[in-house]
Amino acid sequence: MLRECELSKRTTRAARSRPRAAVKRSHLRPVHRQPSPAQRDELARWDEFEDNLAVEVGKRNVGLQKRPPFDTARGYLKREVYRYICERLDQKAGVSLQWCIEEAREGRLPRRPSFRDNPFHWALLGLQNRPELNLKKGEISRFGRQLLYARRHKVPAHFLVGFIYQTGSPTLINRRVADDEREPWYGTLGN
């Protein structure tokens, strides 16, 4: 009896020490695929956007003088990501944009939120591998929810930073995004 117990312990340990078979999951980086012409165009557009953003954010990080929120590096980053993603979604380029971000992303892909739920979060994750942008994990989540909340209100990119500052704290915006709430004035504008 004792021998059987020892034997089963050994086989369990051996089974645990074996490498697991590769399982394809949606949150893991996809296997390299051959891009379609639309995806190649989107990837070139994304690379150009990423490079321009890194240069501009780097320029805005120079100097220690106080700036209004609109002119800070973080304000510029939010505004440009918002502008780019809204433009691509309005042109119905969501599928190729998602593929492009998956290709640009280093590491695991998020399970939540999905690209459909929050494309801004995914775009910020795609930019995370750029050291010039210095994006932290908490900022990605917070900025993604702020941009999604602004998109629900159809805020023009130029007014984005002001809208975020006027609507309240990040905690309040998080709650409103989770509850699918809108600002009280939104329904009165005929939207």
Task: Give a label for each model feature.
Residues M1-R74:
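N-terminal intrinsically disordered, low-complexity, charged/polar
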Residues T11-T12, T72, T167, T171, ...:
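Residue-identity detector for threonine
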Residues G58-T167:
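Short, Lys/Arg-enriched phosphate-binding patches
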Residues S169, I173-N191:
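Intrinsically disordered, low-complexity, charge-dense segments enriched in Lys/Arg
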